[in-house]
């Protein structure tokens, strides 16, 4: 299934019910006063975050969402029934924006968090409300107030601790499938990962966990929409840490440094804040002879730039425990610093 992480929808809250024109009519009261009730309130349109949804696919194909109108007022001063709210479930991590202005209306990051995107109209007043000393039998009532309407844009950003980045086919999907229960489609060609994947990783004594997000491989020009484009970069904006995987086995001359620079250039072009995120850099496919032959030079080149490389093999599992431990410790330090600043 294609992953849908954006949707534009029209929402219309319910109109308020019409006020009632009515007069008291009883056997011995031929000229009773006005007793028309007020109209009921129209239903609100409410966006609700829920973990039971993980895509915006449904909203991509159902764009119009209209709440019910309030009931009309009735005689005997009976108020019309208020309409129920229309709730629209979205995945946790959804950003709600006004489609026209781009204004961020809500950032729904917790289960059950909700935001009213369109308020229902108030019911019109019945004729009983308009009776005065000089007009004891008003023959008019108010119409209900129309409900709010607007176009909104929804944008989903996956919530994960660690975002895995790298060029296509460096082994990100193989890595996440080995270390977590996630099972992304894996094949030996670029752009196998067509959708982001989340995986929960347990390490050490299995009491420590973190969440990985595997996104499609980036290529030069990704921030301008080349390849899979920038639509997936937003999913790593909320991560605390980036795991940058490189592959030096694809040709005889590659040391991984050029690839490393390409990816970081794309991150910087997309968001200056993204490039400032801490990165752990790891070189995959140490099970291949060509990688083992070139590994020493690659380690030296990165070390000269002040970067420690973590070699591993997603195919055999070699080096993965040490890499997971390093990621876990880095996350603990980041969270500790965040707690200190709160």
Swiss-Prot record:
Domain (OBG-type G): residue spans on this chain: 160-332
Gene Ontology biological process terms in this record: ribosome biogenesis
Enzyme class: hydrolase
Annotated EC: 3.6.5.-
InterPro entries tied to this protein: G_OBG, GTP-bd, GTP-bd_Obg/CgtA, GTP1-OBG_CS, GTP1_OBG_dom, GTP1_OBG_dom_sf, OBG_GTPase, P-loop_NTPase
UniProt key word Chloroplast: no
Binding-site positions, Mg(2+): 173, 193
Domain Obg: 1-159
Subcellular location: Cytoplasm
GO molecular function (one): GTPase activity
Needed co-factor(s): Mg(2+)
Keywords: Cytoplasm, GTP-binding, Hydrolase, Magnesium, Metal-binding, Nucleotide-binding
Tree of life domain: Bacteria
Stored NCBIfam families: Obg_CgtA, PRK12296.1, PRK12297.1, PRK12299.1
Function: An essential GTPase which binds GTP, GDP and possibly (p)ppGpp with moderate affinity, with high nucleotide exchange rates and a fairly low GTP hydrolysis rate. Plays a role in control of the cell cycle, stress response, ribosome biogenesis and in those bacteria that undergo differentiation, in morphogenesis control.
Subunit comment: Monomer.
Membership in a protein family: Belongs to the TRAFAC class OBG-HflX-like GTPase superfamily. OBG GTPase family.
Protein name: GTPase Obg
């Amino acid at each position: 299934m294609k992953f849908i992480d954006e949707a534009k929808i029209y929402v219309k809250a319910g109109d308020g019910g019409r006020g009632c024109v009515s007069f008291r009519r009883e056997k011995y009261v031929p000229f009773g006063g006005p007793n028309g009730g007020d109209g009921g309130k129209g239903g609100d349109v409410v966006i609700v975050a829920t973990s039971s949804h993980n895509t915006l696919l449904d909203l991509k194909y159902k764009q119009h969402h209209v709440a019910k109108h309030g009931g009309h007022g009735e005689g005997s001063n009976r108020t019309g029934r208020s309409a129920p709210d229309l709730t629209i479930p979205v995945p946790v991590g959804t950003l709600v924006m006004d489609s026209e202005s781009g204004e961020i209306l809500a950032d729904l990051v917790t289960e059950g968090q909700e935001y009213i995107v369109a308020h229902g109209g108030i019911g019109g007043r019945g004729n009983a409300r308009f009776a005065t000393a000089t007009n004891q039998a008003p023959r008019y009532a108010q119409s209900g107030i129309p409900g709010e309407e607007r176009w909104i844009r929804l944008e989903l950003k996956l919530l994960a601790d660690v975002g895995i980045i790298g060029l296509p086919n460096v082994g990100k999907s193989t890595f996440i499938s080995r270390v977590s229960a996630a099972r992304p489609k894996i094949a030996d060609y670029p752009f196998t990962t067509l959708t982001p994947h989340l995986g929960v990783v347990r390490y050490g004594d299995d009491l420590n966990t973190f969440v990985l997000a595997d996104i499609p491989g980036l290529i030069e020009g990704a921030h301008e929409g080349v390849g899979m484009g920038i639509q997936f970069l937003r999913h790593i904006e909320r991560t605390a840490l980036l795991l940058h995987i490189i592959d030096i086995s694809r040709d005889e001359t590659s040391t991984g440094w050029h690839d490393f620079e390409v990816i970081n250039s794309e991150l910087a072009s997309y968001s200056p804040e993204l490039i400032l995120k801490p990165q752990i850099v790891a070189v995959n496919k140490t099970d291949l002879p060509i990688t083992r032959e070139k590994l020493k030079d690659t380690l030296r080149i990165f070390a000269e730039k002040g970067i420690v490389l973590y070699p591993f093999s997603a195919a055999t599992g070699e080096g993965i425990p040490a890499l997971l431990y390093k990621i876990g410790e880095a996350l603990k330090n980041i969270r500790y610093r965040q707690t200190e600043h709160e």
